């Protein structure tokens, strides 16, 4: 039988904020600027991110300090298909040496590690149940829009921290296996395509 665990709202275990406003990106500053990478929803390609592609931008030092991301931060899109992605390493290690900033179309979830495991929260937010809850709260017809408040109020079960970590580890392993199988399938497709092209004499 499934176990019963207390439910909490996301805002009880994490700080939830919007991404950087568009008006603050590439804003001139007399105090100099810091080069950063701005993450948009297209970069959120899995629950556990080991590499991040972002757009180049320059931010005043105070703005960069206020908006730059940290290891353990979770990003979700503010529109489109809802999903959640965890920064598993320091941002500079994910981006080739740049600080990272969540773009205007993202929300940032910074989990209090003393209350919950960030990897577990990222997994919970990626489940079909959480996605359905966010879809139900969305505004907009052609494109679903997710508010920061709706994200902050989403509720989910919170088991003991040790179990949170075990569940997150299992989810991480499953994602790694899926990626490995996908890469194998791509390689097999490339080999097959090459072989068939040789049969046709259709070679570069």
Task: Enumerate the predicted regions with their spans.
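Compositionally biased, charged N-terminal/linker segments
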Residues: 30-44
